[in-house]
Protein backbone atom coordinates (compact mmCIF):
# COMPACT_ATOMS: atom_id res chain seq x y z
CA UNK A 1 0.00 0.00 0.00
CA UNK A 2 1.39 3.41 -0.92
CA UNK A 3 0.17 6.72 0.33
CA UNK A 4 0.18 9.78 -1.81
CA UNK A 5 -0.18 13.12 -0.10
CA UNK A 6 -2.06 15.58 -2.23
CA UNK A 7 -4.49 17.93 -0.54
CA UNK A 8 -4.89 15.33 2.17
CA UNK A 9 -4.05 11.65 2.45
CA UNK A 10 -5.20 9.31 -0.31
CA UNK A 11 -4.60 5.60 -0.10
CA UNK A 12 -3.85 3.73 -3.31
CA UNK A 13 -3.31 0.05 -3.79
CA UNK A 14 -0.71 -1.43 -6.09
CA UNK A 15 -2.88 -4.44 -6.80
CA UNK A 16 -6.06 -4.79 -8.78
CA UNK A 17 -8.01 -7.51 -10.55
CA UNK A 18 -6.88 -7.96 -14.13
CA UNK A 19 -8.23 -10.13 -16.94
CA UNK A 20 -5.45 -11.13 -19.37
CA UNK A 21 -6.17 -12.00 -22.99
CA UNK A 22 -4.36 -12.21 -26.30
CA UNK A 23 -5.04 -11.67 -30.00
CA UNK A 24 -2.90 -12.47 -33.04
CA UNK A 25 -2.73 -11.07 -36.55
CA UNK A 26 -1.48 -14.03 -38.62
CA UNK A 27 -0.11 -13.06 -42.04
CA UNK A 28 0.14 -15.49 -44.96
CA UNK A 29 2.93 -13.65 -46.82
CA UNK A 30 0.57 -12.85 -49.72
CA UNK A 31 -1.05 -9.74 -48.23
CA UNK A 32 -3.78 -11.64 -46.38
CA UNK A 33 -4.47 -11.96 -42.66
CA UNK A 34 -6.43 -14.61 -40.82
CA UNK A 35 -9.80 -13.28 -39.70
CA UNK A 36 -12.32 -14.88 -37.37
CA UNK A 37 -16.06 -14.29 -37.62
CA UNK A 38 -17.17 -14.41 -33.97
CA UNK A 39 -20.77 -15.47 -33.98
CA UNK A 40 -21.28 -17.46 -30.79
CA UNK A 41 -20.21 -14.79 -28.30
CA UNK A 42 -23.14 -13.21 -26.43
CA UNK A 43 -22.08 -9.59 -26.99
CA UNK A 44 -19.18 -9.62 -29.47
CA UNK A 45 -20.32 -10.38 -33.03
CA UNK A 46 -18.33 -9.78 -36.20
CA UNK A 47 -14.81 -10.07 -37.57
CA UNK A 48 -11.61 -9.82 -35.56
CA UNK A 49 -8.35 -11.71 -35.15
CA UNK A 50 -8.29 -15.00 -33.22
CA UNK A 51 -7.22 -15.04 -29.59
CA UNK A 52 -8.46 -15.71 -26.10
CA UNK A 53 -7.72 -15.76 -22.39
CA UNK A 54 -4.43 -16.37 -20.64
CA UNK A 55 -5.15 -19.24 -18.26
CA UNK A 56 -4.11 -19.14 -14.61
CA UNK A 57 -0.41 -20.05 -14.34
CA UNK A 58 0.11 -19.79 -18.12
CA UNK A 59 2.70 -17.49 -19.69
CA UNK A 60 1.46 -14.93 -22.21
CA UNK A 61 3.27 -16.00 -25.40
CA UNK A 62 2.47 -19.72 -24.99
CA UNK A 63 -1.16 -18.68 -24.41
CA UNK A 64 -1.43 -17.06 -27.85
CA UNK A 65 0.15 -20.13 -29.49
CA UNK A 66 -2.40 -22.35 -27.69
CA UNK A 67 -5.36 -20.12 -28.53
CA UNK A 68 -4.39 -19.96 -32.21
CA UNK A 69 -4.18 -23.76 -32.35
CA UNK A 70 -7.55 -24.16 -30.62
CA UNK A 71 -9.38 -21.59 -32.73
CA UNK A 72 -7.74 -22.05 -36.15
CA UNK A 73 -6.07 -25.47 -36.24
CA UNK A 74 -2.76 -23.75 -37.04
CA UNK A 75 0.42 -23.85 -34.99
CA UNK A 76 2.06 -20.44 -35.11
CA UNK A 77 5.80 -19.99 -34.69
CA UNK A 78 7.69 -17.11 -33.14
CA UNK A 79 4.81 -14.69 -32.52
CA UNK A 80 6.01 -11.14 -31.86
CA UNK A 81 4.38 -8.93 -29.26
CA UNK A 82 3.45 -5.73 -31.12
CA UNK A 83 1.42 -3.94 -28.46
CA UNK A 84 -1.40 -3.96 -25.94
CA UNK A 85 -4.97 -2.81 -25.63
CA UNK A 86 -6.43 -2.05 -22.23
CA UNK A 87 -9.53 -0.71 -20.57
CA UNK A 88 -11.56 -1.04 -17.39
CA UNK A 89 -14.69 -3.12 -17.72
CA UNK A 90 -17.76 -1.12 -16.78
CA UNK A 91 -19.58 -4.03 -15.13
CA UNK A 92 -17.00 -4.75 -12.45
CA UNK A 93 -14.23 -2.17 -12.88
CA UNK A 94 -11.72 -4.95 -13.59
CA UNK A 95 -8.79 -4.00 -15.83
CA UNK A 96 -8.82 -5.89 -19.14
CA UNK A 97 -5.50 -6.24 -21.00
CA UNK A 98 -5.14 -7.72 -24.48
CA UNK A 99 -1.60 -8.67 -25.56
CA UNK A 100 -1.44 -8.10 -29.33
CA UNK A 101 0.79 -10.32 -31.47
CA UNK A 102 1.83 -10.61 -35.11
CA UNK A 103 2.99 -13.89 -36.64
CA UNK A 104 3.87 -14.96 -40.18
CA UNK A 105 5.11 -18.51 -39.69
CA UNK A 106 2.66 -21.33 -39.17
CA UNK A 107 1.93 -24.96 -39.96
CA UNK A 108 -1.12 -27.17 -39.97
CA UNK A 109 -4.49 -27.16 -41.66
CA UNK A 110 -6.86 -24.23 -41.30
CA UNK A 111 -10.13 -25.16 -39.58
CA UNK A 112 -12.87 -23.20 -37.88
CA UNK A 113 -13.91 -23.78 -34.28
CA UNK A 114 -16.85 -23.15 -31.98
CA UNK A 115 -15.44 -19.62 -31.54
CA UNK A 116 -16.25 -18.82 -35.18
CA UNK A 117 -15.33 -19.33 -38.80
CA UNK A 118 -11.77 -18.44 -39.83
CA UNK A 119 -10.67 -17.32 -43.29
CA UNK A 120 -7.96 -15.33 -45.09
CA UNK A 121 -8.81 -11.74 -46.00
CA UNK A 122 -6.74 -8.97 -47.66
CA UNK A 123 -5.21 -6.74 -44.99
CA UNK A 124 -5.49 -3.75 -47.34
CA UNK A 125 -9.31 -4.11 -47.33
CA UNK A 126 -9.84 -4.98 -43.67
CA UNK A 127 -10.05 -1.41 -42.29
CA UNK A 128 -12.97 -0.63 -44.62
CA UNK A 129 -14.97 -3.76 -43.84
CA UNK A 130 -18.41 -3.24 -42.32
CA UNK A 131 -18.19 -6.69 -40.72
CA UNK A 132 -15.63 -5.77 -38.03
CA UNK A 133 -16.45 -6.12 -34.36
CA UNK A 134 -17.20 -2.74 -32.80
CA UNK A 135 -13.93 -0.95 -31.99
CA UNK A 136 -11.70 -3.45 -33.80
CA UNK A 137 -10.71 -0.91 -36.47
CA UNK A 138 -9.21 1.23 -33.69
CA UNK A 139 -6.83 -1.60 -32.79
CA UNK A 140 -5.54 -2.24 -36.31
CA UNK A 141 -2.85 0.50 -36.20
CA UNK A 142 -1.23 -1.25 -33.23
CA UNK A 143 -0.80 -4.36 -35.40
CA UNK A 144 0.31 -2.52 -38.54
CA UNK A 145 2.25 0.58 -37.41
CA UNK A 146 5.73 0.66 -35.90
CA UNK A 147 4.92 3.96 -34.17
CA UNK A 148 1.93 2.77 -32.12
CA UNK A 149 2.23 0.12 -29.43
CA UNK A 150 -0.77 0.73 -27.20
CA UNK A 151 -4.40 1.68 -27.37
CA UNK A 152 -6.44 2.26 -24.25
CA UNK A 153 -9.86 3.54 -23.44
CA UNK A 154 -10.29 6.02 -20.62
CA UNK A 155 -13.20 5.86 -18.23
CA UNK A 156 -14.45 9.05 -19.91
CA UNK A 157 -14.77 7.14 -23.19
CA UNK A 158 -11.70 8.58 -24.93
CA UNK A 159 -9.44 6.42 -27.10
CA UNK A 160 -5.71 7.06 -26.60
CA UNK A 161 -2.87 5.76 -28.80
CA UNK A 162 0.72 5.61 -27.57
PLM feature segments, named:
Residues 75-83:
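A short coil-to-beta-strand element that immediately follows conserved catalytic motifs
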Residues 142-162:
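Charged phosphate-binding loop/patch that engages nucleotide di/tri-phosphates or the phosphate backbone
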Residues 87-109, 125, 139-142, 147:
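Active-site-adjacent beta-strand/loop module that shapes the phosphate/pyrophosphate-binding cleft
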Residues 32-69, 158-162:
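Conserved Nudix-box catalytic region and its N-terminal flanking loop in Nudix hydrolases
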Residues 25, 35, 98-102, 120:
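Conserved hydrophobic/aromatic beta-strand scaffold that supports enzyme active sites
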Residues 111-142, 162:
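NUDIX/MutT-family hydrolases
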Amino acid sequence: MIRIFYQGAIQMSRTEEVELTNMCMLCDGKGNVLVQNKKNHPTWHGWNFPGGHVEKGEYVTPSVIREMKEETGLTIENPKLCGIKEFHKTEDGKRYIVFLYVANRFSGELKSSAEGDVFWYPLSELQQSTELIDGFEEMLPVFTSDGISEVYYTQDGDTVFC
